[in-house]
Amino acid sequence: MAARLLAPPGPDSFKPFTPESLANIERRIAESKLKKPPKADGSHREDDEDSKPKPNSDLEAGKSLPFIYGDIPQGLVAVPLEDFDPYYLTQKTFVVLNRGKTLFRFSATPALYILSPFNLIRRIAIKILIHSVFSMIIMCTILTNCVFMTFSNPPDWSKNVEYTFTGIYTFESLVKIIARGFCIDGFTFLRDPWNWLDFSVIMMAYITEFVNLGNVSALRTFRVLRALKTISVIPGLKTIVGALIQSVKKLSDVMILTVFCLSVFALIGLQLFMGNLRNKCVVWPINFNESYLENGTKGFDWEEYINNKTNFYTVPGMLEPLLCGNSSDAGQCPEGYQCMKAGRNPNYGYTSFDTFSWAFLALFRLMTQDYWENLYQLTLRAAGKTYMIFFVLVIFVGSFYLVNLILAVVAMAYEEQNQATLEEAEQKEAEFKAMLEQLKKQQEEAQAAAMATSAGTVSEDAIEEEGEEGGGSPRSSSEISKLSSKSAKERRNRRKKRKQKELSEGEEKGDPEKVFKSESEDGMRRKAFRLPDNRIGRKFSIMNQSLLSIPGSPFLSRHNSKSSIFSFRGPGRFRDPGSENEFADDEHSTVEESEGRRDSLFIPIRARERRSSYSGYSGYSQGSRSSRIFPSLRRSVKRNSTVDCNGVVSLIGGPGSHIGGRLLPEATTEVEIKKKGPGSLLVSMDQLASYGRKDRINSIMSVVTNTLVEELEESQRKCPPCWYKFANTFLIWECHPYWIKLKEIVNLIVMDPFVDLAITICIVLNTLFMAMEHHPMTPQFEHVLAVGNLVFTGIFTAEMFLKLIAMDPYYYFQEGWNIFDGFIVSLSLMELSLADVEGLSVLRSFRLLRVFKLAKSWPTLNMLIKIIGNSVGALGNLTLVLAIIVFIFAVVGMQLFGKSYKECVCKINQDCELPRWHMHDFFHSFLIVFRVLCGEWIETMWDCMEVAGQAMCLIVFMMVMVIGNLVVLNLFLALLLSSFSADNLAATDDDGEMNNLQISVIRIKKGVAWTKLKVHAFMQAHFKQREADEVKPLDELYEKKANCIANHTGADIHRNGDFQKNGNGTTSGIGSSVEKYIIDEDHMSFINNPNLTVRVPIAVGESDFENLNTEDVSSESDPEGSKDKLDDTSSSEGSTIDIKPEVEEVPVEQPEEYLDPDACFTEGCVQRFKCCQVNIEEGLGKSWWILRKTCFLIVEHNWFETFIIFMILLSSGALAFEDIYIEQRKTIRTILEYADKVFTYIFILEMLLKWTAYGFVKFFTNAWCWLDFLIVAVSLVSLIANALGYSELGAIKSLRTLRALRPLRALSRFEGMRVVVNALVGAIPSIMNVLLVCLIFWLIFSIMGVNLFAGKYHYCFNETSEIRFEIEDVNNKTECEKLMEGNNTEIRWKNVKINFDNVGAGYLALLQVATFKGWMDIMYAAVDSRKPDEQPKYEDNIYMYIYFVIFIIFGSFFTLNLFIGVIIDNFNQQKKKFGGQDIFMTEEQKKYYNAMKKLGSKKPQKPIPRPLNKIQGIVFDFVTQQAFDIVIMMLICLNMVTMMVETDTQSKQMENILYWINLVFVIFFTCECVLKMFALRHYYFTIGWNIFDFVVVILSIVGMFLADIIEKYFVSPTLFRVIRLARIGRILRLIKGAKGIRTLLFALMMSLPALFNIGLLLFLVMFIFSIFGMSNFAYVKHEAGIDDMFNFETFGNSMICLFQITTSAGWDGLLLPILNRPPDCSLDKEHPGSGFKGDCGNPSVGIFFFVSYIIISFLIVVNMYIAIILENFSVATEESADPLSEDDFETFYEIWEKFDPDATQFIEYCKLADFADALEHPLRVPKPNTIELIAMDLPMVSGDRIHCLDILFAFTKRVLGDSGELDILRQQMEERFVASNPSKVSYEPITTTLRRKQEEVSAVVLQRAYRGHLARRGFICKKTTSNKLENGGTHREKKESTPSTASLPSYDSVTKPEKEKQQRAEEGRRERAKRQKEVRESKC
């Protein structure tokens, strides 16, 4: 493609399309038909497909014409032209271009069979169609039409408007049809799917107009699809819709799996809970005196009585009657009521398990977790608390697992799509550069010749070599990305090959992608201009070195960092002056070494425009432009790169950070950088460089090149030249010398880091001031706040004006932050002037945006804003699609259900008024759709089903749910996660340059240190001591600091004359003018000392110590710290040498028994207190030492640990008994008291033993020991308090609640949990960081909430009737208070408990909104609010909904998903540190995990022998056939179907039919069981599934006869049959199409160990919190979410409540009663059986309890689930993409068993051909296969047998080809084999199949020759008979005894001795390396 485009197309490309052109096309078509040879066979290979011509992607219809074609010649706009794309040379097409150069392609056949391309009418139609105004008109029409669709009651004249719209659409379609043709050829009207939409819309419009089709509103909804037309008009949207459709396709497997799982769970639910939810408390006994007898005429009507609502018990304040159950742990009825089935199900009868369909809906609701707490509570109340287990299963498997799988799939689809577009962009850029080169070449050649003579010609081969060598392009992110799938990778590789082939013609043998990556940005660094290093190098080395900063250190010269340009390393020999090679000696030059690791070459700088406040002043900043031009460069640099001033990127601690070779610099002079006044410019290389390296200008660069560079710059400027002129005149103020002087002074002040610090402090204070607003406020306080606001506004305004003076408006507004500041300041000033205008108080909220200024100096906030910015950019199109979807569904809902809501409103509301959630008008309809997208669909759907019928509502809501929620929101998440990658995270942290804030902090520290020193010195001087000694350390400190950073490894530093020598032997001196490097001999070699990192020395100017980061200094004393900083040094992706840790650092492990106890005290203690020093050789000391050793042995003993664990579990269990009934159970209470003491003593003893054994140092430096210590201390204190009788003290009571932490001690003992906790602790810093950022983010919304709603949530309420007063009766607080005076008990002026009266309360309210729990009440209160202290009015302030919508999108959506992003990202980083191991698993679990992953992990098993008995044998054959299995599976499925048919209300007849069908199934399964037992004999019980089947059959038979008894005491036996569905898993292997589902299940299996650990941790957290809840909230008043079953009174109830909140469901209900204060509760309420008084909660404790639990469980644990599933899913997908999967190996072994019935693991050679043919694809070698098998050269052992692994390996090799992977696979298989067969003697192979064949052939040849010889001798006749014998004999002998000395052929077998095998492997490796080297050299 590129090759084709390289020739500049020029104006002759534009040829008008004439009849001759058409004739030419026809001629070409005829020619190509003649040329085409007939196909040899039907098979086509992928390569052929690839080599076929494809349409050029740049010249697709709808794209802009590439600029290389230049401008369209006059008169050819909107005129048919010949096609540009060679692909269409043999197709009848032509193209037309409009003014915007957009390309339209048409079919050249006659449209509608009449209008040829040259017809006038058709040409006019084409002109209209391609005109931009035409599409604008259509777009406006669609938008206007959409507006009209939103009218719920359209006016009469709207009918005419409708006709107008239809007319316009018809005209549009006619134009398209005339221009394009209707449907016959390509590019006609109906060939574009988007036109189908138009066509159907128009047809529906006409049909509905002329034919009466009944329900018009349903058909009117069709018009809504017009909104979709916007997608076809806006280009970006089509791609997003493409991505959506792709992800839906990918979701098919997950959908199937989800439906299957839900069906299984629904069946279980059906069996368990059928009819239970109708249990109600009915008045009992019946009172017959009432009117039921109806005047004695009619008898008592039981049906009517049972269904009469007035007879049910309803809890006051609730709408639904109370449910109950008849089991002991279900809900009980109050006195006078009996529990029985009556009335309908809850929620209009829609929540039930009575039929399969309702059960399925209930389960779907559980999976999406919508209002599931309600279902959970109802079911537990009706069936019993034990059924919590069912919900745990469904939530963890269904909800967490399946929903996250959907996320994983969408994320993968998105990632792949992204990858493809990225590659395309890169390809485009490479082509663009190549074209530019071509265009410039002509102008250049003359000068090039002249230059070449003067500078020494550069030979062509050098250029070629350089093209090769410089090609270290960084790995594309697809290679790095885990989520890109196999097929995509293969496609990409093919594309790459093709691309390279095509481009090599245009380039001088250098891969253009590499050239692009490595050449300078303008593409104009001509090769002819490259000169040898020394020519330019000398000139610039001085300057460069002074500017070379230490990568990764804060020394980066800050003043110029922002204007640095994307400079690129030149590939190959001709490097930039001052680059690393300047210092490399000739032998070890960087490039020569870099051969082996291509990806470690230098790559372009990241275009991160983090400029400091100097940037504006330092000249026109160009960073932004470069990033615009080459967006892809941004991504090219991964996070561990650091940038020096030259723009050379070195990858610290990543690939290629250690450049090969000793880096020995020449002696070069350093120029000290003097600290310039900020006004003067510090000139750096970066500034000298404009686009190309302009340093060339100084030496050689010719004027021509210069002009070219400028030309390119010109072409890439945003604005017209006149704008720059204007800017220069008016926006850059340099009018007068005095003015300039003033500017410099102001600049000095404003740019000072201290001013930045002051401003930051002001921002924080201002935020605090705004956060202090509350309701009610005193006037004085309000006044203080107002004054504060004025002061801050003044400060910020002053800052802005001063900056404007210092920087000039032009430069001021170059920087994003300044624009932001200006915007906020203007708003603040505007707000001051409009302060008194009513309704503009919202403007105050804009002040809050100042908080974002903190981002300047807070990297995480900065990152968050960037991420949101990036995503919003990328999400723009997605958001539009989402908006269109929401709009369409809102209109559909309004059109379909609007009327029904109005007409049937009484069904859903007793007052017959429209409820808050309805679809009668567009706004409310929109709100419902938005609510569904938030995941709350079930409640609104019930309403809809009640008023508008079930079918339609279900369809519409399910569509919104699936399309909107699952797909779009998941795409959002995927986008967020992808923009949230390590790059963004690390880039902000170590961006190399420090912000002003850090500098000012360092200055302050420096000042404090200086003051201290002076004081110290002063004191010293007065005490007559030598001053000099004391001052010296400061210099030393400075030098150490500098060196520590320079060395970057924090090694020890010694003073060495003038030089400092670090632990690695490199030295760097500071302050000396000429530098030398002293390098020890043993450090010389890079190999000996892989730690050697050489940094270029730096001159230390005055300013540099400001940049010193104090943390870096600490690394001297902390080698660990420095290791962390070099975070993943060992990841040697690119480097040839891994960095080994220093030897000393690795402690030699000794066997644990012999370790002596550590020292008791720290060295400091021992020095200060001599008594701590003990001689352990004699006397008391010796006894003490013996005691310690004894204690050590005890503590280290396994039994001791087990005993302690047992005690911990017992003591934790004991806590669970301390519920509200403990005082009634005297014995238990006494036992617990004694047990508590015992436990305390045991734990104290344990602690004393550990102190003695380990010593204080070891004990108190271990975090887990601290935990133990604190918990024991709490127990001890409460024990002492009890003994002293202080147990009732408040403080002691609260201490006792801390005993709930006891189970935490189990953490350190259970490895599974400890692993997870360690991983979590590792993540805490980043989680905290994000939590803080979220809090800041929410602060803005909270303050805004306070501004909008403070004091407006109060209302006047009648406590007795529980009714709010209407606004007509009570208007405000004063009126309510008057009423209260008259009737003080009943009426109250109340506040909503969750409100916005202050920022703290606002946070709580926002948390409820963000978790969508309790958010309705908050929103209703907001929407009804009027003014502070006024009675609310229904929907008076309806647009306040929008505040919540915005908060949900930004506050909830972005920030909560950010948590997921951070956690996933963090664990991925931790995994990298642990070498890719899973950090959530213990060692044992890792083994299991690896076993799951390893291929070929099976070994041949001994099959069940076939019985000798004839009949048994026949049955055996029948039972072991696959068909038999499949039939049984089908029977199981049929049985399931019959179970689905069951309903709760079925008739007697139906019941009988089902009974008999069930009986038939039981007989079938019994027969299967009997047959199998008969055939398999005792082997039947060796298979797990058979045992399970046997148990199920027995239970079913027993169940048939004893059904009633079993049902009563156990679960129904039918339930076990549901479990048999698991057997379906066995069929999946047989279905080829089920590969995707197998992958998903495989992913689940792989996730299990890690998920189990997290589950364990979650259980522990729940346990601790439930104990805590019991001790704090046991006596809380029953209301809202707390009642007789769901409460904190007992341990079981607490666990039930906490499990519910794990998904954050219903936590608002549980919190509300705890927030009660009198008079809502009573402090004196008695509790019978307990001494406790009162039923009030403790609000602060309650809020802390719930919020912390939600953050821990919901955000952390649940998100860890997501992280693990995403991870394992990507691994599983990679594995399933392999050509050979686990299943292929399994089938191999299954077939093997038939050929090797005794499981000898060998097969005879003669059977090999049959075996190979019997295998399944891909391992199968179909017959005739003899020759192929012989060629495989398989080793054989005596007896002509071949080992299974050798065969498997050879066949695998045949599938995978010979590759490195194969060696790994082979090794794995051999390991497994040796591990599973330790007893096997190593069989020595004696020959191979190939050798055998060679022997046979040679034997035949020899025999023939010998025969001929004998014949010639005349012996032949006599010896015929004996010859035959001999022949047989020799043959047999040969078989039996091949001489051992025979040199064996070259084969490699499992059965070979180990040593020889290793040697061979080593040789093979050397051979391969040699080959690769040869290949590389041949390329050069």
UniProtKB/Swiss-Prot annotation:
Cytoplasmic compartment segments: 1-132, 180-193, 235-253, 409-753, 804-817, 858-873, 977-1199, 1250-1263, 1310-1326, 1461-1523, 1572-1583, 1632-1650, 1766-1980
Effect of residue 1872 to Q: In DEE13; gain-of-function mutation; increased voltage-gated sodium channel activity; impaired channel inactivation
PTM statement from Swiss-Prot or TrEMBL: May be ubiquitinated by NEDD4L; which would promote its endocytosis.
Lineage: superkingdom: Eukaryota
Effect of substituting residue 1719 to R: In MYOCL2; decreased voltage-gated sodium channel activity; results in significantly reduced inward sodium current without changes of voltage-dependent channel activation and inactivation
Tissue expression summary: Expressed in the hippocampus with increased expression in epileptic tissue compared to normal adjacent tissue (at protein level).
Topology with respect to the bilayer: Multi-pass membrane protein
Effect of residue 850 to Q: In DEE13; uncertain significance
Binding locations of Na(+) 2: 373
Induction notes from the record: Up-regulated in the hippocampus after epilepsy.
Activity regulation details: Inhibited by tetrodotoxin and, more weakly, by its metabolite 4,9-ah-tetrodotoxin.
Subunit structure comment from the entry: The voltage-sensitive sodium channel consists of an ion-conducting pore-forming alpha subunit regulated by one or more beta-1 (SCN1B), beta-2 (SCN2B), beta-3 (SCN3B) and/or beta-4 (SCN4B) subunits. Beta-1 (SCN1B) and beta-3 (SCN3B) are non-covalently associated with alpha, while beta-2 (SCN2B) and beta-4 (SCN4B) are covalently linked by disulfide bonds. Interacts with NEDD4 and NEDD4L. Interacts with FGF13. Interacts with FGF14, GBG3, GBB2 and SCN1B. Interacts with TMEM233. Interacts with the conotoxin GVIIJ. Interacts with the spider beta/delta-theraphotoxin-Pre1a.
Entry function: Pore-forming subunit of a voltage-gated sodium channel complex assuming opened or closed conformations in response to the voltage difference across membranes and through which sodium ions selectively pass along their electrochemical gradient. Contributes to neuronal excitability by regulating action potential threshold and propagation.
Medical condition linked: Cognitive impairment with or without cerebellar ataxia: A disorder characterized by markedly delayed cognitive and motor development, attention deficit disorder, and cerebellar ataxia. Features include bilateral esophoria, strabismatic amblyopia, unsustained gaze evoked nystagmus on horizontal gaze, ataxic gait, dysmetria in the upper limbs and dysarthria, with normal strength, tone, and reflexes. Developmental and epileptic encephalopathy 13: A form of epilepsy characterized by frequent tonic seizures or spasms beginning in infancy with a specific EEG finding of suppression-burst patterns, characterized by high-voltage bursts alternating with almost flat suppression phases. Patients may progress to West syndrome, which is characterized by tonic spasms with clustering, arrest of psychomotor development, and hypsarrhythmia on EEG. DEE13 is a severe form consisting of early-onset seizures, features of autism, intellectual disability, ataxia, and sudden unexplained death in epilepsy.
Protein name per UniProt: Sodium channel protein type 8 subunit alpha
Lineage of the organism: Eukaryota, Metazoa, Chordata, Craniata, Vertebrata
